[in-house]
Amino acid sequence: MHLLIAAAGSGRRMGADRNKLLLAVHGRPVLAWTLEAAGAAQSIDWIGVIGQPLDHSAMAALFHHAGQPVTWIEGGSTRQESVERGLQALPGDARHVLIHDGARCLVAPQVFNRCAEALLEGGAVIAATPVSDTIKRVDAQGVITDTPDRSELWAAQTPQGFSVSELREGHAQARARNWVVTDDASLFERLGWPVRVLDAGPGNIKVTTPFDLTVAAAVLAQR
């Protein structure tokens, strides 16, 4: 299975002056933990990291944590563009791909394996977790307008798995129609293509804020 790790973000929401994936959590950069988990997944036999040129040397120094060769891919100005560049860089024999946020450093190797297995057996799939909070929809003034049925709500995570040809087609359609999406599953949704969820549990968090770093450090300290 081919894996693309999206690592071209910034530390803006973290309040940091550099890519958040290079910030330390429990003694290692965030990306190091993500690479270690990916490398420990038996299903993963090719890894590409999509990042910005200014982070290349710092990230390349972490590739050994994967325990297998890692391909560097220069990202674009948005996540959407970066993933499209990642798809272009895949080996010619790639038929399926998992896309994973580098900031989800608590991901367990078995989550990669389960997503890979589900993808090969039944088509597009994403890691997710059922929403436990009551969600409110509000208007521009902050007034509640609706309370969606919680039993139908899942929080999307990564990895997200797709057919390479279908995901490339999805990105081509997005470019042609000027669609802007925050994850790849949204492309399939807009095109009416089915995507299933795989329960990865609530621990597969995305490290985005200083609080997330604290939580991640506590979890890693207990492993």
From Swiss-Prot:
Pathway: Isoprenoid biosynthesis; isopentenyl diphosphate biosynthesis via DXP pathway; isopentenyl diphosphate from 1-deoxy-D-xylulose 5-phosphate: step 2/6. It is an enzyme of class 2 (transferase). It comes from the Bacteria. Its EC number is 2.7.7.60. It catalyses: 2-C-methyl-D-erythritol 4-phosphate + CTP + H(+) = 4-CDP-2-C-methyl-D-erythritol + diphosphate. One of its GO terms (molecular function) is 2-C-methyl-D-erythritol 4-phosphate cytidylyltransferase activity. GO terms for biological process: isopentenyl diphosphate biosynthetic process, methylerythritol 4-phosphate pathway. Keywords: Isoprene biosynthesis, Nucleotidyltransferase, Transferase. The record marks 150, 206 as: Positions MEP for the nucleophilic attack. The keyword Nucleotidyltransferase applies. The keyword Plastid does not apply. The record marks 13, 20 as: Transition state stabilizer. It holds the Pfam family IspD. NCBIfam families: ispD. Belongs to the IspD/TarI cytidylyltransferase family. IspD subfamily. Catalyzes the formation of 4-diphosphocytidyl-2-C-methyl-D-erythritol from CTP and 2-C-methyl-D-erythritol 4-phosphate (MEP). PANTHER family: 2-C-METHYL-D-ERYTHRITOL 4-PHOSPHATE CYTIDYLYLTRANSFERASE, CHLOROPLASTIC. This is 2-C-methyl-D-erythritol 4-phosphate cytidylyltransferase. It comes from Synechococcus sp. (strain WH7803). The lineage of its organism: Bacteria, Bacillati, Cyanobacteriota, Cyanophyceae, Synechococcales.
